[in-house]
Amino acid sequence: DFRPDYLFLGTVVKKLGTPLVLALTATATKEVEADICRILFSDRKIDKVRCSVDRPNIFLDIEEVENDAQKDELLIGLVEKMRGPGLIYFSSKKKADETSRMLGRKTGLRVAAYHAGMLFDERYSVLQQFLHGELDVVCATSAFGMGINKPDIRYVIHYHIPLDLENYVQEFGRCSRDGKQGRIFRKRERPIFAYL
């Protein structure tokens, strides 16, 4: 159900004469992987390669906060302290907008929001500014993710925790793809055991 149009890829591959196909994913569950294999490679032998998602260069940090005011205070401190580009993930478009304005005012950093409620041109502009080092921080919903590869993102903060482990891993996977040190912050809001 992630990308319904992908269900038609098997038909397209057959219409093209069954050329060689390479399917890659960083976050597919075993069930989704089985669906991909069934749809794309139903009548062919395939080779699967799996790699670890372990990223020893990324430090996961949990900060305990009591309320939203304390969370915002902590957020300001983290953003001021961290070096390099950063992402802050939200489950609310409104909160992403509000926090981007607040961080810009209180830190003097170059901050913008990114979410599906924005016009395409606005989102594209924010993405290009971030990729070219013209923004320090992006306050985003999960709309900021797929296909975005900025190797030097040094930290990811989860203001709100994603609903499932797959999205959590995908979002913090944006951090430090160049192999240098990175940090992931989240507040103690929901026990990590909820994902197990």
Predicted regions and their residues:
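Helicase motor core with emphasis on the C-terminal RecA-like subdomain
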Residues: 1-196
